[in-house]
Curated annotation (Swiss-Prot):
The complex is composed of six subunits: RnfA, RnfB, RnfC, RnfD, RnfE and RnfG. Its EC number is 7.-.-.-. Part of a membrane-bound complex that couples electron transfer with translocation of ions across the membrane. It is an enzyme of class 7 (translocase). This is Ion-translocating oxidoreductase complex subunit A. The keyword 4Fe-4S does not apply. The lineage of its organism: Bacteria, Pseudomonadati, Pseudomonadota, Gammaproteobacteria, Enterobacterales. Belongs to the NqrDE/RnfAE family. It is a multi-pass membrane protein. The gene is rnfA. InterPro entries: Ion_transpt_RnfA/RsxA, NqrDE/RnfAE, NqrDE/RnfAE_oxidrdctase. It comes from the Bacteria.
Amino acid sequence: MTEYLLLFVGTVLVNNFVLVKFLGLCPFMGVSKKLETAIGMGLATTFVLTLASVCAWMVNSFILLPLGLIYLRTLAFILVIAVVVQFTELVVRKTSPTLYRLLGIFLPLITTNCAVLGVALLNVNQSHNFMQSAVYGFSAAAGFSLVMVLFAAIRERLAVADVPAPFRRSSIALITAGLMSLAFMGFTGLVKF
């Protein structure tokens, strides 16, 4: 149990996919203008990342490795992610039409989110077992969601703040993301792998 807790804390805080590994920056910058949208995107990404991580592990363990098709890993994982995203899109459309409209084009873009593919590839490269894959996928998604919600809350405050003209919009957003990344560097050394 301690191993899974360390994996969770290490992935969420120490090795955050957005602020440390710089994966998933497109939705991080694009969907974080409103807190409501960021929460929805975080939930959708959490579902997709966790499910895609487990499915990718199963495809790798039960199909690619036994058949010696390791060279097809990236292509196979992209297909797995596309199927999981389509399934998620159907679920979100049926359960929350408002969230589906708010997420707009960003929901199908989860397919091309490099964080999802990155988690799947790192998962198999680190030789995780099934349970570790599930925890790693969920932890990466939790870290992504945490950073996204914090960033959206800050951006909402910045939207009404008196920011100098040269720093408005994207400039202040990038500066804020950099400062958040520096803050997360404070967690370095918290968990040793």
